[in-house]
């Protein structure tokens, strides 16, 4: 179990201070860095003092950017983010991509492998194809217990994700929205069926 913090938390009034006080915890900084190589490197240098265990970067930043980021990351595991789980083929076409989402994810997984990234983030729906070209950790967001998918599109249940080969599951709102204790029990019940 680890703690995942996004840009909104890190940039909040007390976010950085809170993260700096966490000791002996797995810290996953989900910043989804997406910029030119120099800015990606500068961003990683700017948060080195937080000693995060995992840090995300968009593979769409390009090979030079992710390779430079990996070089400067040190002990921090650099995680390549593929296509966001809130996007499907229609949404990708709207922003100028003509390839199928699975083809894009597969191409990005190959690039992550070439840059020697430590892990990759992709939808649980793509894990099986990603495993063919990327042999390290695979982290899957968009995990849902039921049909309430919020703004996620490419979703699966925890059991389906593990069956497909996911190493780590990111489960946010299904746990944090509403009664957390009850939601955790729902997760436990789901996994024990």
At which residue positions do the language-model features occur?
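Conserved alpha/beta-domain cores
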Residues: 1-20, 31, 37-40, 124, ...
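Conserved, mostly hydrophobic/aromatic
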Residues: 3, 32, 55, 112, ...
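Glycine-rich beta-strand-to-loop/alpha-helix junction loops that act as flexible
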Residues: 5-7, 141, 171-174
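Acidic (Asp/Glu)-rich catalytic clusters
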Residues: 16-24, 46-49, 68-74, 131-132, ...
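Conserved anion-binding
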Residues: 35, 39-119, 123-128, 135, ...
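Catalytic-site microenvironment of enzymes
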Residues: 50, 71, 182, 186-193
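Glycine-rich phosphate-binding active-site loops on the catalytic face of alpha/beta enzymes
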Residues: 54-65, 145, 154-158, 162-183
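Short glycine-rich, acidic/polar surface loops and turns
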Residues: 126-130, 151-160
């Amino acid at each position: 179990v680890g703690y995942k913090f996004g840009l909104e938390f890190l940039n909040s009034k007390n976010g950085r201070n809170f993260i700096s006080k966490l000791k002996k915890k797995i810290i996953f900084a989900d910043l989804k860095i997406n910029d030119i190589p120099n800015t990606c490197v500068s961003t990683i240098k700017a948060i080195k003092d937080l000693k995060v265990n995992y840090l995300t970067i968009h593979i769409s930043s390009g090979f030079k950017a992710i390779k430079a980021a990996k070089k400067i990351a040190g002990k921090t595991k650099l995680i390549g983010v593929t296509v966001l789980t809130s996007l499907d083929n229609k949404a990708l076409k709207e922003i100028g991509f003509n390839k199928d989402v699975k083809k894009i994810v597969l191409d990005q997984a190959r690039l992550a492998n070439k840059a020697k990234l430590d892990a990759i983030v992709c939808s649980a729906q793509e894990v099986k194809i990603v495993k063919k070209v990327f042999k390290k950790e695979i982290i899957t967001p968009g995990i849902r217990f039921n049909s309430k998918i919020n703004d996620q599109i490419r979703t699966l249940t925890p059991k389906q994700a593990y069956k497909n080969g996911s190493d780590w599951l990111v489960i946010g709102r299904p746990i944090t929205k509403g009664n957390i204790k009850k939601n955790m029990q729902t997760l436990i019940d789901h996994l024990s069926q």
